Amino acid sequence: MSAFRLWPGLLIMLGSLCHRGSPCGLSTHVEIGHRALEFLQLHNGRVNYRELLLEHQDAYQAGIVFPDCFYPSICKGGKFHDVSESTHWTPFLNASVHYIRENYPLPWEKDTEKLVAFLFGITSHMAADVSWHSLGLEQGFLRTMGAIDFHGSYSEAHSAGDFGGDVLSQFEFNFNYLARRWYVPVKDLLGIYEKLYGRKVITENVIVDCSHIQFLEMYGEMLAVSKLYPTYSTKSPFLVEQFQEYFLGGLDDMAFWSTNIYHLTSFMLENGTSDCNLPENPLFIACGGQQNHTQGSKMQKNDFHRNLTTSLTESVDRNINYTERGVFFSVNSWTPDSMSFIYKALERNIRTMFIGGSQLSQKHVSSPLASYFLSFPYARLGWAMTSADLNQDGHGDLVVGAPGYSRPGHIHIGRVYLIYGNDLGLPPVDLDLDKEAHRILEGFQPSGRFGSALAVLDFNVDGVPDLAVGAPSVGSEQLTYKGAVYVYFGSKQGGMSSSPNITISCQDIYCNLGWTLLAADVNGDSEPDLVIGSPFAPGGGKQKGIVAAFYSGPSLSDKEKLNVEAANWTVRGEEDFSWFGYSLHGVTVDNRTLLLVGSPTWKNASRLGHLLHIRDEKKSLGRVYGYFPPNGQSWFTISGDKAMGKLGTSLSSGHVLMNGTLKQVLLVGAPTYDDVSKVAFLTVTLHQGGATRMYALTSDAQPLLLSTFSGDRRFSRFGGVLHLSDLDDDGLDEIIMAAPLRIADVTSGLIGGEDGRVYVYNGKETTLGDMTGKCKSWITPCPEEKAQYVLISPEASSRFGSSLITVRSKAKNQVVIAAGRSSLGARLSGALHVYSLGSD
């Protein structure tokens, strides 16, 4: 059967089985294992484990997925379900360590090295499953996904998330690192299971047949599963937005915990288990005098499973080769050339049909002035950005966070880069910031994610700007994720302290302090104060969120330790999982500071009470709170009106000309808002296309809705990032809106991938009503039509527009666009693109 004839049937079969879910998927686990290996530094005694794992990728990758091998009913009718279950827990690891130490003393031969690599893969799977499935933990990935997107139903989130993670992985990531053959140490597994159970519980044929099914399932995922992206994106915006970054059980967090368990496994292999505490939950293992974070509790995964049909088996030659102790499975190519050719041809034709081939509008800007990148993968360069004149030379400088930055032995410690501007603006050449940034600050806590948020203010009121940096995952090694904010004092010579002068911490577990930061005058003394948003903080419940402010003042001294519980001003969210503080914005209205706080997953549950069934509540309506501090009561609220819209995800303000009248306006983004598109006489729902509302701001009334903007593609997250700034020196602010997940083709991922766009609207050409709905073309909405510029992503699938900022020099005001998933310098490391608009 050819690959092309297989594809439609496979896609239908996978789609029909998706609602049943599956174990946390093959692709997801393989990606976690790949990332965990990237910065592993593990050379104990006579073994360099990183080199061993790199040499034996065939065994390592097979081991990563193996624990789920016997779950599906296609594997001998599911009779060995319990064997898979036992492979997820510490007793299996303990039995494996003792088996290897008793039978294969160092130095190891190649087959034993493969066994060790296979075991390391299994331990990655063990660690990842605990936080992904919330096994013995609160607020792991799937449990939070259930609370946000499935009315609190863990089982529904489990069903969608396990297989949806694979769909997302295949849609977003390049799996060109996947080994074309896998090795399973069958004879050794028989010995390990006999040691674990004290009797024979499984046969060689069962291990070979069921692990071969896994291998074929991986082939199926590589072939077609990414085409289900629209289905799973519709089901769960949380899955799409938080898959990599979520603090407990996101991809990066699971990779971090994989590296931790690798260190423990190597310790046990070389020293035995006598100096280890081995609770059943593998995330709580401790060796060598380390303290357990908590014993945790073992909970059965109780997975959903999909049954793959034998049609897949018929499509791939049964390439199985036995060795003395194991078996190899092989495939000539993971993605047949015929399929790649077909996809590319279809993509070209559809782009030509709907976009007009390669012709670009004159308003399109496809080439940046310069691009800045990093040479280390997964850094998330540009996750946070701010601009200020740090060295006090009269030119704006760029401050950029890379919270995912890692180097060997130091995972996700994070970095902050300072790039100084001059008469020409920012450096007009491409830069590797690790080599050419003017200043670098580096985090020092394991997986602390230093650089997740930034703010510049004169905190100690000495006339020199200081820098505040958020590190919301500090405490991840203890599973507390309390977070921290570090303040670096500036000097009159234009420099900055090399270590933090002030540390602000939080006592609550899962506080994630420092997720958002803002400089705004809270106490009315005309000096900006430090405002901290923690949307995942308990706030008296679960992820209600808090916003706290510390007043600036000369009494703040060097090396001071502050607790957020003692903040000068604090407000809290209304509901569990409402993420109050997800976005922050400050604006001066009639000489008073208006502080705006976004709570995008607010759902008005408190109003519903027990009058309505939980299924009747509207998920993630979103709400924005407006405060005139120091008053802690909100002056107004703006609430979303459509489920899953997430109003308040982004906020910005400025001055525009509205029908000839100068207006101070507030922009509020609802990036997952469902809008309606009209193509001639056909009406289509644009799921998660995104929308932005523009309000008039006054100090004595509720903001008045003036205009709306809408995206033109499903899932594009139009309005997910907003900014207003005067780009042409006419005294009016241009409106800048990003759609970082926009997909060029109208099939929303069936053919092409993300290309991201940023729209710039001139500040003197705004009108009342629907700005993007009155179109000359036969397709509405038309966000490009009224835009002055449309910035086109220079790189596909890079999340172009994931954040943006403007940097002003004496001569120009430049736009800096982050592409958080760019692979310009290294895989998914992120990049910054600099544009000079309106300054010719």
Curated annotation (Swiss-Prot):
A single GO molecular function term of this UniProt record: glycosylphosphatidylinositol phospholipase D activity
BP terms from Gene Ontology: cell migration involved in sprouting angiogenesis; cellular response to cholesterol; cellular response to insulin stimulus; cellular response to pH; cellular response to triglyceride; cellular response to xenobiotic stimulus; chondrocyte differentiation; complement receptor mediated signaling pathway
Domain of life, source organism: Eukaryota
Signal peptide positions (record): 1-23
SUPFAM superfamilies: Integrin alpha N-terminal domain
EC number: 3.1.4.50
Subcellular location: Secreted
Any single Pfam family the record assigns to this protein: Zn_dep_PLPC
Protein role: This protein hydrolyzes the inositol phosphate linkage in proteins anchored by phosphatidylinositol glycans (GPI-anchor) thus releasing these proteins from the membrane.
Family: Belongs to the GPLD1 family.
Assembly description: Monomer.
Name this protein carries in UniProt: Phosphatidylinositol-glycan-specific phospholipase D
Species in which this protein is naturally found: Homo sapiens
Gene from which this protein is expressed: GPLD1
